[in-house]
């Protein structure tokens, strides 16, 4: 069950960008990035949150989107009200090393949001050393 788990916290994303507030745009952006990275989408769900207090009924609202991959998953969360988004990419490396594909997917999505700043993290999952320690 070896794999690579990548996360990115994006700040300074323009709230007016459709990728921040329009589920169909975020969905097509994610699916195109998945395909371009050479990964396989097997399912997806994108949800736009309902406007409400304290921002008001016309305020832009965020989206949570998940793409199930044959190799694991992609999750995206947007907060246009604070110009932020988070990305989470996890790929299994059981039959093949998908690390390069995961990096390509994360980089493509970061580019789509055009953030002012990015905080990235990488976690190696299921190392042999961890398995031996059990």
Regions found by a protein language model. Give the residues of each.
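Polybasic/polar functional segments that serve as interface/processing modules
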Residues: 1-134
